C-alpha cells in the first residue's frame, strides 16, 4: 500500500539545483602543449570554468522566487586546493547576493596522495590537492552543515530544515559503502541506520523530505544500465526501495553529467524519482528549478540552460550549442579511434575514467571491434539479435543499410541532453537493446564485468 504524503498541507517550495561544477583554478596552468592535450580529451570546460559558473550563478540570482540553492557534489575538477579556495569564495558571494547554499562533496573533490594534475608549458606537473576527504567537511561547513538539525560525520551527511514542513537530506554517498573493507559509493550500515532514524523523525513531524546525493540511483536509460554499471550507486536497487517505502520519494543526483528524470515503483506501490542534472560546465550546461507541491501531489521540474557566457569565445554560438559540438565531436573521434588509432583513443578515454594504459593493453581486442563497429549496419545487427529484438527483416527494410555508428552518436547525444526520440517501441531501440543484451550475456558467460575490467 502506497505511503501517505508527508507535509501534505505545505505551501509549494522552489529549489534551484546544480551539480558537477568542476571548478578549476587557473593557477594550475592553462597554456602550453600539456594543457592543450588535457583539454582536447575533456568532456567539460577546464580553464574557463570560472566564466561559465559565474554566468550560471548570475542566472540563479536573477530569479528572486527562491533563495535555496543545492549542489550535489564534484565542486572542483580534481580536488585541487586552489580550486576549492576560489570556488568557496564564489559560493560565499552567492550567499552575499541572498542565496542559501547547501553543498555535498564527491569523488572529484579529493585525491588519494594529495596531488592533482597541473600544467607548465610542455609538462604535466603535480599541484596540491585535498587528500583526506573529511577535510572537506570543515572547508564547506558554512554551506549546510552549520545549519544542520542532525549530522552523520563519518559519511559527511546532514539534514537541514529548509522551510516549515520541508527537510533537506544531504546524503554524501562518496566512499561511504564499506563492506569487508571495500570502498565505493553508497551508504554504510551505520549511515543507513541514521538515515532511517531521520526519516522516522520527519514522518512524526509531518515533514516533506527532499534529498540529494551524488551517484545515480536509477539508470538514466537501459543502455546506461549496461555500460555504466560501475558509475551507479552500490546497491541502488535495494536502497531506493527502502527509501521509497520509508517516505523518501525524490532524490536529486549528479555524477553522470546526464540530464534525466527517471522513476521506479516499489512492490508496495511507492514511487521513487531520480532527478539528474547535467554538469554546468559540460554538455548540456544545465541547472534545474524544482518546485515541490505536496498539497497537489506533484513536483514540477524546469530546465535552465546556460546560453550566454561573457568573456568566452564560442565561435558566435550559444554556449549550449558550442558545448554540444565540442563534446559530441569528441565522441565521434573516440568511435573512429577505436578502429584506427589506439594511441589517440588511450589519450581520450581518461575523460570517462578508463585508464589509457588499460586501453593499450586491450588494443588487440578493441581495434578489430572498432573496425567492425565503424562498418556495422542495422541489417548486420538484426542478424545477430533477431530473437532478442523481436523484429522481422521486413520491419527494418528502410533502415537496414544505415550505419549503427551514426545512430550511436545520436543516441549518446539524446542520452546526455535528456531527449528520447527512440523509445522502447522503436526499431532502433529494440535492435540496440538486443545487441547489448547479446554482448552482456556473452560477457556474463565468461564472467567478465567490462566496466570493472576497463577501469581496473
Question: Could you say what each language-model-derived stretch is?
Answer:
Residues 12-26, 165-176, 212, 273-278, ...:
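Active-site-proximal beta-strand elements of phosphoester/diester hydrolases
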Residues 20, 69, 74, 87, ...:
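Divalent metal-coordination and catalytic microenvironments
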Residues 1-81:
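N-terminal active-site segment of His-dependent metallophosphoesterases
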